[in-house]
């Protein structure tokens, strides 16, 4: 094994890589350069056999086979183009949350998306070669870290937990501030209580794999309280960043540069950033689309050179003004491909997060996004039409898949 790995040293060029190799004696070797890589390698073998990543979520029963063969000289080494790749469960009010808490794993009270559901979500993420998850956070839903068993199943599957642009420090602010907070969620007039609110979560999750969102907006997708002008908001945000990082340094790692952190200039926060906000060099800047698929800002040469790198938060599902798109997977795959290809080429390569709503019915767009995050050149090489055709044939069979392609 050691000689084989020496001969295939490219396996260790990046984290999360894997190798599938047929040995001279006919044995198949699956090797990962870390735990994630090993999982992705095993899932790749599953894909080769014909098992869909959506096997459970889409009732995609794999075709029965009596045998499966690989060439005697078969070697496949893969590793990700983007380091952190994941989804955001959002607008879960009518679909995922009631299905989870009332049907899939009924609780004594509704509102929980629990560990049994998350086990299925995290298995899907590994099958899609993803590793990051932003939990659902609407007021109807019990917070991820306040639901027994959730953090344990995230550790089991090796999933990094993050949070959206209005949930700093891994707190589901819309729900948790009403329970744990005191006074107004206002860093100008109530900073002591707000900081204590964040501190409680950081202390209890210090040993969890978390990609911390830092900064501050309003309680739920609105601008911050207490600061009226953009200049005031900029000054307050800089104080917030400093104080949040002190918490992370105190409880997570004294080397703050070793703690994954992301700042998300979403909606009005982009104006604050453009007003001259100073974001520490080691923090990842996560850019956003306009909620309809067009990225609002691509990193400059100075931003590309930052140690923290750049990320993207992208929507294929949205609830908000001027109109929603939630119930059908209507988002254009071609637009998704074009925007994400440009994002990667312009230096957005640290973290990609996709707002998938309830997961269903956007299976194809989700898989396209994750395939690009894993191998940015794969879709370009085969063409988006061929990529879609392969998806349809795998899910519905070759004949029906060909018939569906012109419809899709």
Question: What are the language-model segments listed below?
Answer:
Residues 1-79:
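Contiguous, structured surface segment used for ligand recognition
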Residues 25-61, 146-170, 175-203:
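Hydrophobic or amphipathic alpha-helical targeting/insertion segments
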Residues 29-32, 93-115, 131-141, 176-193, ...:
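The substrate-binding groove and active-site-proximal loops of carbohydrate-active enzymes
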Residues 52-111, 116-136, 308-311:
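An acidic-aromatic substrate-binding cleft motif
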Residues 61-70, 138, 145-146, 151-156, ...:
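Gly/Pro-rich turn-and-neighbor structural signature
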Residues 73-77, 175-176, 216, 228, ...:
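Substrate-binding groove of N-acetylhexosamine-processing glycoside hydrolases
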Residues 82-85, 128-132, 157-160, 208-211, ...:
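Loop/turn elements at helix/coil->beta-strand transitions in domains of secreted/extracellular proteins
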Residues 110-111, 115, 123, 135-150, ...:
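Trp/Phe/Arg-rich N-terminal binding region typifying the photolyase-homology
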């Amino acid at each position: 094994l050691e000689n084989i790995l020496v001969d295939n040293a490219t396996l260790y060029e990046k984290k999360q890589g894997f190798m599938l190799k047929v040995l001279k004696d006919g044995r198949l070797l699956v090797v990962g350069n870390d735990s994630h890589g090993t999982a992705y390698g095993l899932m790749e073998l599953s894909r080769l056999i014909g098992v869909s990543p959506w096997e459970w979520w889409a009732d995609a029963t794999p075709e029965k086979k009596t045998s499966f063969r690989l060439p005697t000289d078969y070697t496949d080494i893969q590793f990700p183009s983007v380091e952190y790749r994941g989804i955001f469960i959002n607008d879960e009010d009518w679909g995922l949350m009631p299905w989870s808490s009332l049907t899939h794993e009924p609780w004594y009270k509704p509102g929980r998306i629990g560990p049994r559901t998350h086990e299925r979500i995290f298995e899907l993420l590994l099958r899609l070669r993803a590793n990051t998850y932003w939990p659902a956070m609407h007021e109807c839903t019990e917070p991820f870290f306040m639901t027994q068993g959730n953090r344990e199943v995230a550790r089991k599957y090796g999933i990094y937990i993050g949070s959206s642009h209005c949930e700093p420090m891994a707190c589901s602010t819309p729900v948790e501030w009403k329970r744990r907070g005191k006074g107004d969620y206002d860093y100008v007039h109530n900073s002591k209580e707000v900081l204590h609110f964040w501190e409680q979560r950081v202390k209890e999750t210090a040993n969890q794999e978390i990609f911390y969102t830092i900064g501050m907006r309003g309680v739920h997708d609105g601008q911050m309280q207490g600061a009226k002008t953009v200049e005031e908001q900029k000054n307050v945000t800089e104080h917030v960043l400093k104080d949040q990082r002190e918490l992370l340094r105190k409880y997570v790692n004294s080397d703050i540069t070793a703690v994954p952190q992301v700042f998300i200039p979403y909606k009005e926060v982009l104006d604050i950033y453009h007003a001259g906000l100073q974001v520490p060099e080691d923090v990842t800047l996560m850019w956003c689309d306009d909620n309809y698929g067009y990225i609002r800002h691509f990193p400059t040469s100075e931003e590309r050179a930052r140690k923290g790198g750049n990320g993207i938060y992208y929507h294929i599902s949205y609830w908000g003004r001027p109109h929603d798109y939630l119930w059908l997977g209507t988002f254009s795959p071609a637009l998704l491909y074009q925007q994400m290809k440009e994002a990667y080429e312009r230096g957005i390569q640290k973290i990609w997060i996709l707002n998938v709503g309830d997961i269903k019915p956007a299976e194809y767009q989700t898989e396209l996004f994750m395939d690009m995050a894993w191998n940015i050149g794969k879709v370009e090489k085969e063409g988006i039409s061929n990529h879609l055709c392969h998806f349809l044939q795998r899910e519905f069979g070759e004949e029906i898949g060909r018939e569906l392609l012109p419809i899709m």
